[in-house]
Regions:
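N-terminal intrinsically disordered, cationic/polar leader segments
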Residues: 1-36, 46, 50-113
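Short, conserved glycine- and acidic-residue-centered signature motifs
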Residues: 37-41
Length: 113
């Protein structure tokens, strides 16, 4: 199963501000190379990383594919509205996969930091 942890901060306005994410594990939906859930999650994560890097000036640290952690991303500076939109889009995509295929393949949890 893919385990996803989304890190969030509460704001004075009552909205959550997503400030990082860790994605690890394998869905186990199909054999390696044919697992559409793993492929979809990977595509979302890589596109998010590249989009933050290219379209924003926000500071971040990120790693992909090291040991059992497939993707680890944390903002290291104030989060711009553009980056927050990209993060919201990533979380929405992951939640849609979880809703469509079930928690036996991907589980998303939110952690206050």
């Amino acid at each position: 199963m893919i385990q996803t942890t989304v890190f969030k901060k509460s704001t004075d306005s009552g909205n959550d501000l997503y400030c990082g994410i860790v994605i690890k594990g394998h869905a186990g939906y199909a054999d390696e190379g044919e697992d559409i859930i793993c492929a979809a999650v990977s595509a979302l994560a890589i596109n998010f990383y590249n989009s933050v890097e290219i379209f924003t000036d926000d500071g971040f640290e990120g790693t992909a594919g090291q040991e059992d952690v497939q993707f680890d991303f944390r903002f290291t500076s104030d989060i711009s509205p553009e980056s927050q939109l990209l993060m919201n889009s990533l979380v929405l995509g992951l939640q849609n996969i979880e809703n469509d295929y079930g928690r036996s393949y991907i589980n998303i949890r939110f952690k206050e930091v």
